[in-house]
Amino acid sequence: MKQTIVAWEAHLAQNRRRSVHTMRAYVATAHRLVEFLGAHWGAEVSSDRLAAVTAADLRAFLALRRSDGLSNASAARELSAVRGFLDFVAGEGTTPRLKGPRVKRGVPRPVSPDEAVALAEDVADSAVEPWLAARDWAVLMLLYGAGLRIGEALGLTGAVLPLGATLSVTGKRAKTRIVPLLPRVREGIEAYVELCPWPIARGEPLFRGAKGGVLDAALIRRAVQAARTRLGLGDRTTPHALRHSFATHLLARGADLRALQELLGHASLSSTQIYTAVDAAHLMDVYRNAHPRA
């Protein structure tokens, strides 16, 4: 089954355009499922056996996972991964129907504009070298000032240089969108590029780790965690909270919901609305008029 899981991982990367984080989680789920079914059935797990898996088998697997302390949200993600894996092995639509746990959607808690800037400044001030300080500031300003996901910011390459008034961003499932760049955000990136000791070619990562490799999102998360403790901010003050704040502050200042969908790269803000195209000029006007740091 190891080869089957490897093939599924390649399928996720090539055909489903899943992020590295999602692929790791899904592959881990597949390994857990195979291990569980082997013990549950008392027999070696094969592709043919997986094709015959029952709803009762899946309920038993989820019950075991829930006994490990899995939340409803995590259990729902686990079930989604299981369905995807079984559909890959046995064919689309062959997985037994199983109702997932009800997930209560939490309300994002944004930080204030002043808190967002203070957070970025504190992270930058804690860096050991000026170019690392400039890097961390630029990354966090992309999250708050342009609404990028951390993975989108770290996925940027030298192809975005030289910077203009907008930025082309590749988001989830390889969807590309155009986001305006506030002067302050653009200046932050340019300051980092000028100080960065590593050459940034078109195909190279824009944001580098201390040794020149790709900057790890975990490093930014840890830096934010340390900064929020020093500043007395809540534990929900994360890199992603800056993106939530971007959206919340724009809406509070009258930004059009459909324009915001485009800026965030969401299929919908309510999980039911469709992804709406808005012309770039209108997006720029909405952005300049609504963003508190514009």
Give residue spans per PLM region.
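Conserved catalytic core of the tyrosine transesterase superfamily
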Residues: 1-294
